[in-house]
Amino acid sequence: MERTTLRRRALVAGTATVAVGALALAGLTGVASADPAATAAPPVSADSLSPGMLAALERDLGLDEDAARSRIANEYRAAAVAAGLEKSLGARYAGARVSGAKATLTVATTDASEAARITEAGARAEVVGHSLDRFEGVKKSLDKAALDKAPKNVPVWYVDVAANRVVVNAASPAAGQAFLKVAGVDRGLVTVARSAEQPRALADIRGGDAYYMNGSGRCSVGFSVTRGTQNGFATAGHCGRVGTTTNGVNQQAQGTFQGSTFPGRDIAWVATNANWTPRPLVNGYGRGDVTVAGSTASVVGASVCRSGSTTGWHCGTIQQLNTSVTYPEGTISGVTRTSVCAEPGDSGGSYISGSQAQGVTSGGSGNCSSGGTTYFQPINPLLQAYGLTLVTSGGGTPTDPPTTPPTDSPGGTWAVGTAYAAGATVTYGGATYRCLQAHTAQPGWTPADVPALWQRV
């Protein structure tokens, strides 16, 4: 979003790590597993990858076209495998990430006896000292302290699944330690990293297109959505409050903000008038639009591309999930940290991995000349918060659970939290269904109730 208070230049510097407490691993070490068992490639068709996305991946990540296609396919498969292992490992799950040119999936656990299960699922196993749940509890305490009073000189904190730590970025060790003291967390689970980062909000319906608020500031469309018969788009909350009117990229009357939250979260949606038709597309800025097929969330290390009305199309990688970041206006929790660059006016724009919607641009530091760090608001929590349906090439992803959940389980192989690829089959209520579009199952999205996702066979 473009506005005077957000035009300060953010400083980008390296980080010097300061350990606040030693991490006790209770004698556990990483497991050097055998190569994971081969699994079938996910259904990511070559036609679904736009020339613009491939070109941006080549430019920003140093990949050739074949490597970019292979990486996206591997990352898609990794997201599905990681989701399944997170569910099956439960409290023993310690996070997942991809790394290397081939996007090799590593899944961490606190239980060495689970290494074989992880390897059999097609991932490399790593045994660590603490579960993801434990670190999420620490981060939750930090978030609560920040909501009571935003910490001074502490811009970012997150769970680093690769390091099996909570990391707090601060202008000085003293500032970081003061924040930990206020939050009352176990310092033995936290690393304070010195950082000069100063994040700020960046300020047909098609992701990445410009829109204008009340005839003044500019932001970018995230993704086309519907709510019942009402069309609209998802975007960032800091771009406008409820009742703020918008004009589209052509400067014609477009819509009105119906929901908006900022700070705390950075989510919003705009209802558009009858002159605007939602499309399952993201603007490729001269290199072909990208089709949106679903919203399966990617894992740490996966590639991700961003479309915005200031800087166009740029790519990078996902660095951390469930990050908290402090802007001048307050703290935002639950965003994803990335290496993609962005600038004011890109706010609200689309983040997408392959054909899967990931989120909308929130803010960051740096720029697209010198590089930087950005944060996006994940799309699935945004859709769920407002009861929206993502417009996709398969007809939409439902987000409204039934008002009265069933009291008895109908049985079958379908399960909440599982990532399903297009073409996968499940049983539910005595019937067999085929998945029509990739997604991660949510409560209420049962095969019998969501024909946009499942077809009975």
From Swiss-Prot:
Residues spanning the signal sequence: 1-34
Domain Chitin-binding type-3: 415-457
Enzyme Commission number(s) of this protein: 3.4.21.-
Region (Linker): 394-413
PTM remark: Predicted to be exported by the Tat system. The position of the signal peptide cleavage has not been experimentally proven.
Sequence segments annotated as region (Disordered): 393-412
Active site: 238 (charge relay system), 266 (charge relay system), 347 (charge relay system)
Coiled-coil ranges from the UniProt annotation: none
InterPro entries: CBM5/12, CBM_sf_5/12, Pept_S1_alpha_lytic, Pept_S1A_streptogrisin, Peptidase_S1_PA, Peptidase_S1_PA_chymotrypsin, Streptogrisin_prodomain, TAT_signal
Propeptide boundaries: 35-202
Domain of life: Bacteria
Ranges of biased composition (kind: Pro residues): 399-408
Top EC category: hydrolase
Any one GO BP annotation for this protein: carbohydrate metabolic process
One Pfam family linked to the record: CBM_5_12
One annotated Gene Ontology cellular component of this protein: extracellular region
Disulphide connectivity of cysteines: 219-239, 305-315, 341-368
Function: Hydrolysis of proteins with specificity similar to chymotrypsin. May be specialized for the degradation of chitin-linked proteins. Has a primary specificity for large aliphatic or aromatic amino acids.
Subunit structure: Monomer.
Sequence similarity: Belongs to the peptidase S1 family.
Protein name: Streptogrisin-C
Species name: Streptomyces griseus
